[in-house]
Amino acid sequence: MFKRPVPKPKLKVRGQLRLNKKRNDYVPGFVYIFHDPKAIRGKGITMCKIGLSRTPRRRKYYLSEEYESNLRIKAIVPTFNMRLTEKLMHKIFADSRDARTPGLDGYTEWFQVDLFRIKMMEISLFAVAAFINLAYFIGIALVIMSLSYLLFR
């Protein structure tokens, strides 16, 4: 039996315009963890968002208005590939993923956390970003060494 696909929820105008733009997020930028202590899911369980942005403090301000909450910055880490870093973080913490209000910008990137998991997220973010940045440095060093060998032998 044929079922019609469920239409995606319409976002507010600003969020919809942002999603319609073609973006390349496999570039240098920042990955952040924002904590919303007001989004209570149980005893000691709140919500954190793992996301990417080139301007994370502006993003915090925008999301605080969008979700009508005062988000707190738990970590902001510079990385050479912000999309890859964010994807790895989402895979690491996939078991605690929980969507927020459907239709709002970034509503699928939220995770249920307690104080221990917040610390785990912060440490993991620094480790993943360090690994990716190191891989980029090694790649650049190998390219420079190869070029110098070819040009100056």
Task: Please annotate each region the language model reported.
Residues 1-153:
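Non-catalytic accessory segments flanking enzymatic or RNA/DNA-binding domains
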